[in-house]
Amino acid sequence: MELNEIRKKLKKELDKGRYEHTKGVMYTAGCLAMAHEYSMEKAMLAGLLHDCAKCIPNDQKIEMCEKNHILINPVEYKSPYLLHAKLGAFLAETVYEVSDPQILHAIKVHTTGEPDMSLLDKIIYIADYIEPGRDKAENLPYIRKIAFEDLDVCMAEILHDTRAYLSSRGGSIDATTKMTYDFYRQYRKKHD
C-alpha cells in the first residue's frame, strides 16, 4: 500500500487530533532520518503507522491481542492503551501490508522502548515525543535540539522525564520501559 493511500485510510480510522499527531510524527521522523542518514521513506511510513491502533477502544485492543496471540503483560492489562503499539505493528502488517521487519519493530516498541534500540526504533520513539503538536514536556526545547545531535542522549533525557512524570502521578511503569531507561541511562553516563 502506498503512503498516500495509507494516509487516506488513516484519516478515516483516527480521530482528528490523533491524525494530526500522526502527520506530525511522520514528518518529524522524516527530518530525523535525514539528520541521522537513515531512509526517509521508511521513517515516514513507520511514523505514519505508529498509532494506527490508538483509537481502538481498550477492551477491543485486549480482545484483538488475545485473538491474534499477541502477548499481554500485567501492566498492559492494567493500562491497555499501551497495547496500541503491539497491536499497531500487527495491523501495519495485516491491514496496511507492511512487510519490512524494521518498520514493524519500530511501531511495536515506540511506546515502551527497549534496550539497545535500532536507529529507526529511536527515530520513531523520539519523533513521537517531539513532533510539533507536543507542548507539555518540561525539557522539550532541549530534547528537540539534541534529537538532531545525539539520539542516545535524547533517549536518556526522554526516558528520565517519562519515568519522573509517571512516578509523580503514581502510574505503573512497564518493566520494558524500566529496562530501556536503565540501558540508556548507563549509556549516557559512559559518554558524558
Located regions from the model:
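Charged phosphate-binding loop/patch that engages nucleotide di/tri-phosphates or the phosphate backbone
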Residues: 164-192
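A short, charge-rich alpha-helical start-of-domain segment used by transcription regulators
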Residues: 16-18
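N-terminal glycine-rich anion-binding loops that anchor highly charged ligand groups
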Residues: 21
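Divalent metal-dependent catalytic cores for phosphoryl transfer on phosphate-bearing substrates
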Residues: 7-12, 35-157
